[in-house]
Curated annotation (Swiss-Prot):
GO terms for cellular component: iron-sulfur cluster transfer complex. It holds the Pfam family HSCB_C. Co-chaperone involved in the maturation of iron-sulfur cluster-containing proteins. Seems to help targeting proteins to be folded toward HscA. The lineage of its organism: Bacteria, Pseudomonadati, Pseudomonadota, Gammaproteobacteria, Enterobacterales. This is Co-chaperone protein HscB. GO terms for biological process: [2Fe-2S] cluster assembly; protein complex oligomerization; protein folding. SMART domains: DnaJ. HAMAP family: HscB. One of its GO terms (molecular function) is ATPase activator activity. The gene is hscB. Residues 2-74 form the J domain. Keywords: Chaperone.
Length: 171
């Protein structure tokens, strides 16, 4: 059973996150291992396994990138373990430039420039995310997989910038 079916949701990117949360809570109550404490060892093991599956499904579906990766996996794209890389040279050059800029910001400890950088990267991420949503809605699986790969780069860059921000604030 796929994660969308487990939560009673249609297998698509845009989901009702409130329904996801409510169903998660219901499933957790229903399959909590403590409810099976007096059951057989097989029942206890099954409850632990089901609870782990529910938690994994929840973690996967609640985050936009992992939800997209999972949806793509249902259509034959195993992005989590693939060695396929982004082949868009212009995008890769842009990422290299952004990484160098972040290094410069770190060296100069320029928090104003960092704030501007974070906003710019967030705008880039949001634009790519919207592009991915449209591709997934239109079942353009190859294009969506490529966009997810690019979103990973941007997400990593955004995370690095936010870590630098925390580091600079500690001074």
């Amino acid at each position: 059973m796929d994660y969308f079916t487990l939560f009673g949701l249609p297998a698509r990117y845009q989901i009702d996150t409130q329904a996801l949360s409510l169903r998660f809570q219901d499933l957790q109550r229903q399959y909590h291992p403590d409810k099976f404490a007096n059951g057989t060892q097989a029942q206890q093991l099954a409850a632990v396994q089901q609870s782990a599956t529910i938690n994994q499904a929840w973690q996967t579906l609640r985050h936009p990138l992992t939800r997209a990766e999972y949806l793509l996996s249902l259509h034959g794209f195993d992005l989590a373990s693939e060695q396929h890389t982004v082949r868009d040279t212009a995008f890769l050059m842009e990422q290299l430039t952004l990484c160098e800029e972040l290094d410069d910001i770190e060296q100069s400890k320029d928090d104003v420039r960092l704030e501007s950088f974070i906003k710019r990267v967030q705008k880039m991420f949001d634009a790519r995310l919207q592009q991915m949503v449209e591709q997934l809605d239109n079942a353009a699986w190859d294009a969506a997989a490529d966009t997810v790969r690019k979103l990973r780069f941007l997400d990593k860059l955004r995370s690095s910038a936010e870590q630098l921000e925390e580091k600079l604030l500690d001074f």
